[in-house]
């Protein structure tokens, strides 16, 4: 089939190459013209030799670009992967790579030394020779001056050969799912990436972009982005060898305080990977290590390596508690569903509002006054708008919202010098954590804020003011996750406007070192602190917008608007540096921070063998990385849905196991980080403990839901369960019938997708039920929606035709599903009555003030009848 599609055959004598497009044949023919008519071309700066003049011209352009970036002619350093060089005697040689590639280690012959007039370079097994006689006229060629760089850099430590032995990893397949054609070189802009530096974070901008159109039309991830991320020459090659270790480096974490639990190295390969993945599903960090048996030893994997102490201890204690009589795990009634009283959160700094700030807010509200419950304009003398009330909204924003989503730097934020529209967006968000009346007031204020912001003089298509973007992000978040359907639909319309403005700013590429100079003091140090925090807020704004966009794509099946590849910033700074009250305190903490670029860290989880994962990531950075993995999964899913797979239908979803392992590797690191905090010698405050508990619950819920979404279409779950509206569209009967058919195939299919998704769902519900006293401390907006998806998954798993489920209480259902292995769980499908679980979750979701969750609650109520 593929041979018939290659209609454009090369007519050069002895060449049997054929191509799918005429343009590919035209570029290929240039190689034959070079053999017949030219002696080759040599760069006079670095002695790199090319077979074609157009390739040399592009190479010289890159020299000029590097010189311009370095500040003058001859100052730029261009590191190229091309290994064909002109030696001092005029002959053409191939410089050997730093280390052989994986392909060469297995089958490829060693690269030769100088090329003789009678020799040629093999283009690989089954390929015709294409190298010209390059040394025939070598003595006549000009001698080049000293080169501009040393040895060529490599992609993930593998030097890439340009003669066809190893395909260039930045060259994309010419056809979806089709063969890679190494002679088709180069698509404009691809050679820029191949000749750029891959040695460090500073070079990501050059290496990741294939062409100008890609650079200016994000967020669409190009093939080269994925080739780099998965460390392959073609994305189709990324998922063929899943039996190889994908997570080999669970090594001990560095301990800044001197005391950590030991975590042994573990290989995730073969059958051992399944065992480890099963253990990861059942991790629970409420661990008393003294309860382990005296004879507790490390289980040996199939290769003799020790498994992780962390994973074994957690899974052992989980099983022990379930079989024991822990009162927290007995559920005689559902009193816990009534919810705990609001916690008294405290924060180190609470910006204080003045009467002038209040007058600015009232003036803004008067331009578009909200209405009360009777439909009358709200009186500006209302107690809900008093100075004390506004101050309470501000306190709630910084103690609840800004703790979960650290966007605004409270130490440098002055509400009395802030634009009223920005301050109003902060206060309205804080009011949603107050009484229902205050929440209703906030919704009314919100309805006019977007117009007020668009009409402000500081708003422009090229925003310079940070507060404009911050206000727009808060307004977008409020409309989507803190209000009703009308506000949500409006927010959806303007979501892409926000992303476009962020792209036009510098927020996605904050690379400046935020460390302080030890020699600074006084006003200089104060200015350095404010500049660093301004950059940090810009960075966090882009990250948070990216995270919310990713959540809505994965958890709601909405279109992904941002790509992980457009985030070129370093990860957020440490909480200590972020929460410092003074410039001196910030300087002390920032000097100990280590910057980590987002994309290389992300690659460390997807392709563990290529990049080492940093062990000193803070918890917010770990959440960013998880969202990066989710974004990659969502985009790969989109590629499956939009790529023509007529020839390779087996590759649809082939990425799922690898991304699932990346999720599990992230969880193992997160668990080890949490365990260290729990067992470390440093005592933390009660407020820090509450924040840690909230973050842990939110992170685990998101991990479970993201893993669940890998194996089931969440829209099918909602539609089959009875949702009346999805993404603003009315669900019709044929939609419901289609979703039920899809779920039936999902349940009865040969793959373990249904079992895997159900195990993640049950684990998520177990975590929620066991965190009885921590429910109200989880301010993450995604948490109730994750519970809803998990409940629907368990319902679908047991709602099989022809099965008569037996009456089951909530605790028995959860325990049965979380303590069974994959094979046993498959046999339990359709055996349990899920109505007690559905009713319990519906009762809990009824307490959430979010229209989307309210609709979800109504779906559960209908299912629980």
UniProtKB/Swiss-Prot annotation:
Pfam families: Fungal_trans. Residues 96-105 have a biased composition (Basic residues). A motif (Nuclear localization signal(NLS)) lies at residues 77-87. Residues 108-132 have a biased composition (Low complexity). Changing residue 639 to C: Leads to constitutive activator activity. It comes from the Eukaryota. Keywords: Metal-binding, Nucleus, Repeat, Zinc, Zinc-finger. Changing residue 237 to Y: Leads to constitutive activator activity. GO terms for cellular component: chromatin; nucleus. Changing residue 603 to N/E/T: Leads to constitutive activator activity. Induction: Expression is induced by nicotinate and 6-OH nicotinate and is subject to nitrogen metabolite repression mediated by the GATA factor areA. Gene3D superfamilies: Classic Zinc Finger. Changing residue 230 to I/S: Leads to constitutive activator activity. Transcription factor that specifically regulates the expression of the hxn gene cluster that mediates the degradation of nicotinate and related metabolites. This is Nicotinate catabolism cluster-specific transcription factor. The gene is hxnR.
């Amino acid at each position: 089939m593929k041979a018939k599609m290659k209609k454009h055959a090369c007519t050069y004598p002895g060449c049997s190459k054929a191509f799918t497009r005429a343009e590919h044949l035209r570029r290929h023919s240039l190689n034959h013209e070079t053999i017949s008519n030219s002696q080759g071309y040599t760069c006079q700066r670095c002695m790199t030799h090319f077979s074609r003049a157009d390739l040399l011209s592009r190479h010289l352009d890159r020299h000029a670009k590097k010189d311009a970036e370095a500040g003058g002619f001859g100052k730029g350093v261009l590191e190229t992967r091309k290994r064909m060089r002109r030696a001092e005697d005029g002959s053409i040689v191939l410089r050997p790579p730093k280390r052989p590639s994986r392909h060469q280690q297995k089958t490829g012959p060693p690269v030769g030394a100088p090329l003789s007039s009678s020799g040629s370079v093999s283009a690989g097994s089954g390929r015709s020779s294409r190298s010209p006689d390059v040394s025939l006229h070598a003595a006549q060629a000009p001698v080049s001056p000293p080169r501009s760089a040393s040895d060529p850099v490599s992609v993930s430590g593998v030097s890439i050969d340009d003669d066809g032995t190893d395909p260039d990893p930045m060259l994309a397949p010419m056809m979806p799912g089709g063969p890679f054609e190494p002679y088709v070189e180069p698509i404009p802009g691809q050679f820029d990436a191949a000749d750029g530096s891959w040695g460090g974070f500073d070079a990501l901008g050059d290496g990741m972009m294939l062409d100008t159109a890609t650079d200016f039309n994000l967020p669409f991830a190009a093939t080269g982005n994925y080739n780099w991320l998965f460390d392959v020459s073609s994305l189709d090659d990324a998922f063929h060898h899943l039996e190889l270790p994908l997570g080999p480096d669970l090594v001990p974490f560095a301990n800044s305080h001197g005391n950590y639990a030991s975590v042994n190295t573990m290989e995730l390969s073969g059958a051992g990977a399944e065992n480890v993945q099963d253990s990861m599903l059942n991790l629970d960090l409420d661990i008393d290590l003294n309860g382990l048996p005296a004879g507790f030893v490390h289980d040996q994997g199939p290769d003799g390596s020790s498994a992780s102490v962390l994973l074994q201890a957690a899974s052992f204690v989980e099983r022990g508690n379930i079989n024991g009589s822990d009162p927290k795990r007995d559920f005689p009634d559902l009193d816990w569903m009534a919810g705990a009283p609001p916690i008294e959160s405290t924060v180190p700094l609470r910006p204080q509002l003045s009467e002038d700030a209040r007058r600015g807010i009232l003036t803004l509200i008067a331009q578009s006054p909200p209405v009360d419950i009777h439909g009358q304009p709200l009186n500006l003398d209302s107690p809900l708008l008093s100075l004390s009330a506004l101050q309470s909204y501000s306190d709630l924003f910084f103690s609840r919202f800004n703790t979960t989503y650290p966007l605004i730097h409270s130490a440098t934020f002055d509400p009395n010098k802030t634009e009223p529209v920005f301050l109003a967006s902060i206060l309205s968000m804080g009011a949603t954590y107050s009484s229902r009346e205050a929440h209703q007031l906030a919704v009314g204020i919100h309805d006019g804020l977007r117009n007020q912001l668009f009409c402000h003089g500081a708003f422009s298509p090229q925003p310079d003011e940070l507060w404009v973007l911050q206000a727009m992000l808060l307004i977008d978040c409020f409309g989507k996750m803190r209000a009703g359907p009308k506000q949500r639909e409006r927010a959806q319309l303007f979501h892409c406007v926000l992303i476009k403005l962020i792209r036009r700013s510098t927020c996605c590429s904050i690379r400046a070192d935020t460390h302080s100079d030890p020699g600074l003091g006084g006003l200089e140090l104060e200015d350095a602190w404010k500049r660093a925090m301004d950059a940090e807020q810009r960075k966090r704004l882009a990250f948070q917008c990216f995270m919310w966009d990713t959540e809505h794509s994965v958890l709601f099946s909405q279109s992904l608007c941002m790509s992980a590849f457009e985030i070129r910033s370093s990860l957020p700074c440490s909480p200590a540096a972020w929460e410092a009250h003074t410039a001196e305190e910030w300087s002390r903490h920032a000097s100990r921070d280590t910057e980590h670029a987002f994309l290389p860290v992300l690659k460390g989880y997807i392709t563990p063998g290529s990049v080492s994962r940093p062990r000193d990531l803070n918890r917010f950075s770990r959440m960013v990385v998880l969202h990066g993995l989710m974004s990659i999964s969502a985009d790969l899913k989109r590629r499956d849905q939009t790529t023509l797979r007529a020839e390779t239908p087996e590759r649809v979803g082939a990425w799922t196991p690898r991304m699932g392992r990346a999720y599990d590797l992230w969880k193992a690191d997160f668990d080890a980080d949490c365990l260290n905090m729990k067992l470390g010698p440093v005592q933390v405050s009660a407020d820090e403990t509450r924040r840690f508990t909230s973050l842990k619950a939110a992170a685990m819920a998101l991990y479970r839901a993201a893993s669940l979404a890998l194996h089931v279409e969440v829209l099918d779950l909602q539609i089959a369960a009875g949702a009346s509206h999805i993404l603003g569209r009315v669900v019709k009967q044929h939609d419901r019938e289609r979703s039920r058919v899809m779920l039936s195939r999902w349940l009865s299919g040969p793959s373990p997708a249904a079992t895997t998704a159900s195990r993640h769902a049950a684990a998520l519900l177990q975590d929620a039920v066991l965190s009885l006293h921590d429910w109200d401390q989880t301010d993450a907006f995604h948490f109730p929606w994750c519970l809803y998806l998990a409940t629907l998954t368990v319902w679908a798993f047991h709602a099989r035709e022809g099965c008569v489920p037996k009456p089951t209480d909530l605790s028995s259902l959860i325990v049965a599903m979380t303590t069974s292995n994959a094979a046993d769980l498959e046999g339990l499908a359709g055996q349990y009555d899920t109505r007690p679980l559905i009713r319990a979750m519906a009762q809990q979701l009824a307490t959430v003030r979010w229209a989307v969750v309210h609709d979800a609650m109504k779906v559960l109520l209908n299912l629980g009848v």
